[in-house]
Amino acid sequence: MSPTLTVDDLAFEVLPSPRRKTVELTVERDGHLTIRAPEGTDDSVLTAFIQEKRFWLYQKIALKNSMRQAVATKEFVSGEGFPYLGRSYRLLLVDGQDVPLKLEAGRFRMPRAAAGNGREIFIAWYAEHALVWLRNRVRLFASRVGVEPARVEVRDLGFRWGSCGRAGTLNFNWATILLPPAIVEYVVVHELVHLHEDNHTPEFWQRVERALPDYKQRKQWLAEKGAGYVVV
């Protein structure tokens, strides 16, 4: 099994797992292609699977590209709106403030002199608040799912919302805190259930549904609108 696999004009990162029983294709929000497969799967098997899914792959790639193009670039000026837990708050640049960024009275407030580092400041603020919020939600839903994660971490996961580490660590993208609370809860439950099931099997989705009976609507919302929230 090679670490990468190219089939015609499609290049994939191959992610083997000794616990995986099925092959799964993923088109990340940036168009990056991954194929997850049981460890030791022959490249010819993966190639045949990809060829069978070619039409679906091209549809997904086109959709991701159109969603990325629709995202407007943010400017760190007074009046610009920035999302937090599904709501948009306007930025106000101020002349004096003791912290780089704070949300107060319905506005993000940032020292005017710090605007040049606005992206880094916002990401740090989002990551700090995401960790607190996500740890609370993980505690809430872990009992429903029947698992106990080792720890919760927030980091830059690129174009992934979350991941479940082998040691029981749940990793979440700092950008999850931009989404509406109900959608973040779906991301949390999704990763918690991965502590039971590596693969997206029928049993996996049954466990998700037991914790979130309306998960299908949340999942669809995330697929259709989530990319538009990564704006800084």
Model-derived regions: residue spans:
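Active-site-proximal or metal-binding-adjacent scaffold patches in catalytic folds
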Residues: M1-Y186, L195-V232
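Walker B catalytic acidic pair
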Residues: E191
